[in-house]
Amino acid sequence: MDLAKIERVYTSYAKIYDRIFGKVFHEGRQSIIQNLNAQPHEKILEVGVGTGLALPMYPRHCQIVGIDFSEGMLDQAKQKAAEHRMDHVELHRMDAGEMEFKDDSFDTVVAAYVVTAVPDYRKVVSEMIRVCRPGGRIIM
């Protein structure tokens, strides 16, 4: 599936995504974030942030950057960030296979439920490695 088609599909589901998939993936997201043991001021990238279901679970003492290719999904995530007053969260529309971040930008990269939903998972994993600092963590 090409990137444009993926974007259309996810944008079409954006407003109902949480009701359909929220409970299904909640336990996995929660487990990932609880086991992060994130340190104060840690910079965390969430690849495929979607509607931002996991955003309220992250510790507020960390800087969270979320990316997604679907504008519709990001709109939902932005609403959640505003509702929960998450000043520590930045959201960007971006292709996970061609991230616009500098090398070694993040302490931790989280990509839950993403690699099966992208056209070229190898590019995405390669980019995650590139933007994660040496000694950092990549969690999928």
Show which residues each predicted segment covers:
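A short glycine-rich, Lys/Arg-flanked "PGG" loop and its adjoining helix->strand segment in the class I
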Residues: 122-137
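Class I SAM-dependent methyltransferase SAM/SAH-binding core
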Residues: 45-98
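A short acidic, Gly/Pro-enriched loop at the edge of an enzyme's catalytic core
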Residues: 97-109
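Short glycine-centered segments of the SAM/dcSAM-binding site in methyltransferase folds
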Residues: 43, 63, 135-137
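Conserved class I S-adenosyl-L-methionine
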Residues: 1-40, 53-54, 76
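A short SAM/SAH-binding and catalytic strip from SAM-dependent methyltransferases
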Residues: 108-120
